[in-house]
Amino acid sequence: MSMPIASTTLAVNNLTNINGNANFNVQANKQLHHQAVDSPARSSMTATTAANSNSNSSRDDSTIVGLHYKIGKKIGEGSFGVLFEGTNMINGVPVAIKFEPRKTEAPQLRDEYKTYKILNGTPNIPYAYYFGQEGLHNILVIDLLGPSLEDLFDWCGRKFSVKTVVQVAVQMITLIEDLHAHDLIYRDIKPDNFLIGRPGQPDANNIHLIDFGMAKQYRDPKTKQHIPYREKKSLSGTARYMSINTHLGREQSRRDDMEALGHVFFYFLRGHLPWQGLKAPNNKQKYEKIGEKKRSTNVYDLAQGLPVQFGRYLEIVRSLSFEECPDYEGYRKLLLSVLDDLGETADGQYDWMKLNDGRGWDLNINKKPNLHGYGHPNPPNEKSRKHRNKQLQMQQLQMQQLQQQQQQQQYAQKTEADMRNSQYKPKLDPTSYEAYQHQTQQKYLQEQQKRQQQQKLQEQQLQEQQLQQQQQQQQQLRATGQPPSQPQAQTQSQQFGARYQPQQQPSAALRTPEQHPNDDNSSLAASHKGFFQKLGCC
């Protein structure tokens, strides 16, 4: 994770291999994002599709969201939500539908939708069609794209040619320039968030930018006033690629996006960065080690055996001041000069187009891609589990034991008829929306049961603590020779009024000292039991 990030990657399971060359000019396909805008006034094909969908009265409305978006198969899942392929039923355009639990601690889809609306119409940025709430989830509908650069990097043997890196780098710089032109900085540059288009489309090999959950305004859109410089900021982004200033806790600006791009370029060229694989007891110390390694690594040592222009690029962007505007065109010319030195041209030919004997990538042959960060083999929350304290582990162990006891009781109470009925329940396709709904309902039920169990465990612990405190008080009173205090039941009786009627006890004056310990303990236990019964938890 890297840091907490909500990556979303869009892909489709039935994508075929890429045909045709890419248009390297990132401005040439500006109208692509407008072809899919919702509009009832479409071609005759669109009208026919709409008529057919309206005439089908038996359609399954449970798989339709946002009025006319049909949910298909699940194509990705991660700690922040689930991704489905879908179809616009009005015009037949394929879309990606992102689901996010509404009760999540840090919802991001609404803010991401606002960012997409700001960027709508920008070349090679997915178009956002809809945001809304469906049951227990927020949903976001955007353009469906192809695999990420990280996926393609894997398929190509975890190393790109210099020519491919140059062409990819030029497009990535242009994407970030367009983002900066809209007064936004990205703050989470990584290969997972740069995708190519769908096969058969004019932009099939164009690089697209997705997932704006970490994006932030660096200046006021009206006054163009830049945000102030600050320090002691928390880390935002992916540690492998973030800038040195970000490691130092400094406010991010345009320069940090450009430096992170440079780290990605070297990642593609080398296949590995010097600060990868560092070990540390926890994430905080690991990020510190990564930052120290970045500072101690000379850019030209990093570029050893590679075109010197890449080292020069990283040196330039690291020297930018906080508010300085990057020279995007100068960076593109610098990197394109690498192709001149090699006698190559930016002809839109990429390494992934040579896969499978020149047929291009194919999901039926290549492994399933890392779908916009969903389904990542090492999600951030998995790493943090290794560093939990002993107290939390003990609580979890107690919870597990309590759950096992309840499961055993439920299993024992299950009748033979229930067992027979469960065997004949139809199995759902795990990639279907119905399966996801069922899974979500089960998850919320489990969370509710877990909260109830935690509450019960806390009440039991509280009761034990109160008993221990009462016993300690009684022991102290007996040690000093003072008579024990009145039973707790009398105080609680006064608190709860006439509804609470504890068993009457003889007065302390009529009891012998030998009677006090037993009487006090029994009355305390009874009083606490009655107290929790009134709360409805025993």
UniProtKB/Swiss-Prot annotation:
The GO molecular function terms of this record are:
ATP binding; protein kinase activity; protein serine kinase activity; protein serine/threonine kinase activity
Q: Which reaction does it catalyse?
A: L-seryl-[protein] + ATP = O-phospho-L-seryl-[protein] + ADP + H(+); L-threonyl-[protein] + ATP = O-phospho-L-threonyl-[protein] + ADP + H(+)
> Which residue ranges are recorded for the region named Disordered?
39-61, 366-428, 474-527
Please name the GO terms of the biological process aspect recorded for this protein, alphabetically: cell morphogenesis; endocytosis; glucose mediated signaling pathway; response to glucose; signal transduction
Sites bearing Phosphoserine, chain numbering: S522, S523, S527
Catalytic EC class = transferase
Provide the Protein kinase domain boundaries: 69-353
Task: List the subcellular locations.
Answer: Cell membrane; Mitochondrion membrane
Q: Topologically, how does it sit relative to the membrane?
A: Lipid-anchor
Low complexity compositional bias: what residue ranges?
41-57, 391-410, 474-498
| GO cellular component labels | cell periphery; cytoplasm; endoplasmic reticulum; mitochondrial membrane; mitochondrion; nucleus; plasma membrane
Residue positions of the active site: D188 (proton acceptor)
- Miscellaneous notes for this chain? Present with 1630 molecules/cell in log phase SD medium.
Q: What is this protein called?
A: Casein kinase I homolog 1
Source species of the chain:
Saccharomyces cerevisiae (strain ATCC 204508 / S288c)
**Lineage of this protein's species?**
Eukaryota, Fungi, Dikarya, Ascomycota, Saccharomycotina
